[in-house]
Amino acid sequence: MKAQSLPNKYLIVVVGPTAVGKTDLCIYIAQYFKTEIISADSRQYYQCMRIGTAQPTIAQRQEVRHHFIDCFPINTFYSAGKFGKESLDLINDLFNKHQYLLLTGGSGLYIQAVCEGLDEMPEISLEIRGYFNNKYKKEGLSALVKELSIQDPDYYKIVDLNNPQRVIRALEVCMATGKPYSQFRLQKKEEHVRPFKMIKIGLNLDRNLLYQRIDQRVDQMMEQGLLEEVRALYPYRDCNALQTVGYQELFGYLDKRYTLEEAISLIKRNTRRYAKRQLTWFTRQTDIKWFSPNELEAIIGYIHAFTGDIGIS
């Protein structure tokens, strides 16, 4: 059954790599259109990860209402599919009082879950699931990443290679079907058509400038108390939510595998690599209009041109 059509309702989707400036831009747009922001960041959902995931500050969340921020306990499993369903329910509800809504994040799969939907994946047997979980425990993530590069090189180029859940999921599908996981992801179905219109905006910067901003953000996070945040989460270090850049490296420091200087350097390097994979994901999409984050007037003008609106006084 198709969803009821929502004419003249627009979901403004703002994507881009980490540290590019999505939060500040979305707050500006949300204030301009007097609307709300839905986060599609797969780590900002979790409580107790405020610094390491660069959650919007309390002051920013008081300026503009944000959804799916700081709302789940650290040990909660929250998938892209579940997010897609729950966020669509929220979007349909919020469109009762807003003409425009914002969806933003750097997690491509979560953005896709809302904008396009995710195709049903094959059932995975307990034997296959157990095989890869045991391999992960015995050989570590690097062995799984190497296998993924062979089994599905296309997905290898865009997935967060520091996230064992996503790497294992892809390998499970490869083994269960004999086909690359990316082949299932790229399928499109008619029932995924959304009843509202989408305006997709991408943010990017010169690569060197982006990397400088990443390094500066990491330094700022350390000054804000990232190490103390990670130390408090150490008992939960095996939770999926914490298998991510910034936390894994500092867990390594706490385990005395790295010096603090080495851990910080690794966070910067791995964040730059993650940003590159984010850009690879998003630049493959032809319906995204790209801007620099400081092109505020041009972005607002593009939204008005898309909707045929002459502007808001």
From Swiss-Prot:
Keywords: ATP-binding, Magnesium, Nucleotide-binding, Transferase, tRNA processing. Residues 41-44, 165-169 are annotated as: Interaction with substrate tRNA. Its EC number is 2.5.1.75. Substrate binds at residues 18-23. The record marks 107, 129 as: Interaction with substrate tRNA. ATP binds at residues 16-23. Monomer. Belongs to the IPP transferase family. Catalyzes the transfer of a dimethylallyl group onto the adenine at position 37 in tRNAs that read codons beginning with uridine, leading to the formation of N6-(dimethylallyl)adenosine (i(6)A). This is tRNA dimethylallyltransferase. It comes from Amoebophilus asiaticus (strain 5a2).
